[in-house]
């Protein structure tokens, strides 16, 4: 049987990795030869989850057409966030919870996108719909994905469906969601030992906003000053990325997991759009974004609207 690769976006977060593993397992249970892979490095937060539930991380690939003809996307759909040669393979399915942009296919496909906080929440439903029992380890990874995407249920993207799914999965996994979740988030917020290049690419995504090319990177921290003390070095590496990729804006967002506020560092010729979008003034290229924790709900749509205004 021909193999199908299942993967999340580049610079994968916990949902991208864990949902690839969970969905590949579901597809295997349903008779497909599916393998989860990843398009980037595994973050400290994700590694904590993999280690905790004793699951091996997926192998890394840069291209997919050299291995398979068919792929399944989880936690993304936009081409620039996917495999470098995504145009050379057939996308069989997409399971996602983001905006739909820069995506089209030549054939009809199974496309499931729901306005929930996490792909794993959708997968929890799909396991039930197919009558497949979720293994303890996989339930733990799916729980980890929901906790990560919802910032332990505090993000505005978090829905009642996400909370309910997390409680179900925590029971299967045999953990206390709140206690485990805080440990996992703290592991992810430990940025010691990371280079500046790693910091700005840990969780970075590219977007087309009107005619502008924008990259938004986000890291979680227990204290934003722990990251911003390196601002001069950060600006240097961000400026290099802006020039290399021809970006109009690179927004580096440092989110405080205790206060649920963020600080944005904006570099690029369109940095003023951040001021316009949030009604703030950039001082030394930074501004506090009160109550902003979600790139998907509080950054991407707000900036997109500002660019198109």
Curated annotation (Swiss-Prot):
Cofactor remark: Binds 2 manganese ions per subunit.
GO molecular function (one): inorganic diphosphate phosphatase activity
Reactions it catalyzes: diphosphate + H2O = 2 phosphate + H(+)
Membrane-spanning segments: none
A UniProt-annotated Pfam family: DHHA2
EC code: 3.6.1.1
Residue runs in coiled coils: none
Keyword list, A-Z: Cytoplasm, Hydrolase, Manganese, Metal-binding
Cofactor needs: Mn(2+)
Superkingdom assignment: Bacteria
One cellular component term from this protein's GO annotations in UniProt: cytoplasm
UniProt xrefs under InterPro entries: DDH_dom, DHH_sf, DHHA2, DHHA2_dom_sf, Mn-dep_inorganic_PyrPase
UniProt binding sites for Mn(2+) 2: 15, 75, 97, 149
UniProt-annotated binding residues for Mn(2+) 1: 9, 13, 75
Enzyme type, top EC level: hydrolase
UniProt subcellular location: Cytoplasm
Family as reported in the entry's similarity comment: Belongs to the PPase class C family.
NCBIfam families assigned: PRK05427.1
HAMAP family, per the entry: PPase_C
Protein name: Probable manganese-dependent inorganic pyrophosphatase
Annotated organism of origin: Bacillus cereus (strain AH187)
Lineage: Bacteria, Bacillati, Bacillota, Bacilli, Bacillales
